[in-house]
Amino acid sequence: MTIHWCGTGLSSIPGLKRLIQLGYPVTVWNRTVAKAEAAIGSYTTDIRAFDMAAVQASLQAGDTVVSMLPGDWHVPLAKAAIEAGAHFVSSSYIAPEMRALDQKAKEAGVAVINEVGLDPGIDHLMAHHLVAAYRGSNAYDVANRVSFTSYCGGVPKHPNPFRYKFSWAPVGVLKALKSPSTSVRAGEELTVTKPWDAISSYTAPLPQPETFEVYPNRDSLPFMAEYGFDPRWQVHEFVRGTLRLNGWA
């Protein structure tokens, strides 16, 4: 079994280092070998130039492909993994084209796993835990008015001009700003094409409270069902959003 780790960008290195340090057989693929060597070369010498044909030729049944490349590569890599009888992992949102591979993956007996980062990923676990705890509490009543907010964002220690800590490809951050969002505000669906049209203020309940700018991220609505919301609930607010330092907008 070999782990084929594709991409050595900003968010790749901690997980990649850990796998290598734990002794797992890892082959690193990157579009620029020199950049990968600079980032991870002290941990492994098995670094290869990323090329779809080369990756496909190297895949064997039981291998795992981890895609930390830009989103356009996820589906082609997942298809290649399924065809080879290998598993696939990414931290990105599940695109419709990725979801369409579900049955093929099941028939091949392999796992195709996405949304396993911080957001999306760990936030899903926390949301499921929160909803389950609410359902099991004495406060639960199907007639209650329910509000759910989940915010995540990279915050620099010292404010920079972009008011954001880049932990993944800057071009990806900018492209995300072009995605429309849908959420629930005051019991009504709110759809905006530009995030800055739905900015609000959020005070984080920290030991020393701090206020941030927040805005809805993508389409929040499907996550109500995924998190176990009862269709009968009166949802006053449901937002999965992005957090930024004040002054971002």
Each language-model region and where it sits:
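Conserved N-terminal Rossmann-fold NAD(P)-binding element of oxidoreductases
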Residues: 3-8
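C-terminal catalytic/substrate-binding lobe primarily of soluble NAD(P)-dependent oxidoreductases
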Residues: 133-249
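ADP-ribose/adenylate-binding Rossmann-like module
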Residues: 80-98
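N-terminal Rossmann-like NAD(P) cofactor-binding module of classical short-chain dehydrogenase/reductase
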Residues: 63-68, 89-90
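Rossmann-fold NAD(P)-binding glycine/threonine-rich loop
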Residues: 92-114
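Hydrophobic/small residue at the entry helix of a nucleotide-binding pocket
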Residues: 10-12
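Rossmann-fold cofactor-recognition segment
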Residues: 42-54
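NAD(P)-binding Rossmann-fold cofactor-contacting core
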Residues: 26-40
